[in-house]
A protein has these predicted regions:
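Acidic, surface-exposed loops and disordered segments
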Residues: 1-103
Length: 103
């Protein structure tokens, strides 16, 4: 990306997100972070690593534990990456026709 395009994009996006309500920005952050997390997990798997997304943790303590700015960063999930010791097992999934309505 040429530098001038980058600068124009950053300026436009900064102005756009500054106008949005905090909740709208938070929802955008959560969606984007979920997509980035998914891509990281797929990339790790492609390189022979296993991953485990973790959502059950004390989000209010994350900034202090990791030494990051609480007002700037939104905790989304913890993600462990490594080599598994044991083979995983398949979990049950409902058939799509049991959980989806097509209208």
């Amino acid at each position: 990306m040429p530098q001038e395009v980058k600068e124009r994009q950053v300026q436009a996006l900064t102005a756009h997100f500054a106008k949005l309500p905090a909740q709208d920005n938070r929802e955008t952050i959560l969606i984007d972070a979920g997509l980035v997390s998914m891509q990281l997990m797929l990339t790790a798997r492609a390189h022979g690593y296993d991953t485990n997304p973790i959502g059950g943790y004390e989000k209010e303590n994350m900034a202090e534990v990791f030494g990051i700015e609480k007002e700037r960063y939104v905790p989304v999930m913890l993600l462990s990456i490594g080599k598994s010791v044991d083979e995983g097992y398949a979990s049950y999934r409902f058939p799509i026709d049991k959980i989806t309505q097509w209208k």
